Amino acid sequence: MKLFKIVTYVPIKDARVVRIAMGDAGAGVLGNYHHASFSSKGVGRFTPSKGAHPAFGGIGSEEQVMEERIEVICEKEKVKDVM
């Protein structure tokens, strides 16, 4: 069985919902466990360019958002569902 690691960054307020959705789609299965993941918190920085539709801030303005990095493992067959 080939496993892949999927990593994503989400605003902290959305992290629980994203972790559950990834687990429900088949990520995080380790033996007799499911919905397994690892998270770490940090600051995400970005500047939206023209044509962007930022959830935070505005075009051309640097933003900083507290984010959670979520890591899960996933069987190859489930990657598309998890993504």
Q: Model segments located where?
A:
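Hydrophobic structural segments
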Residues: 1-83
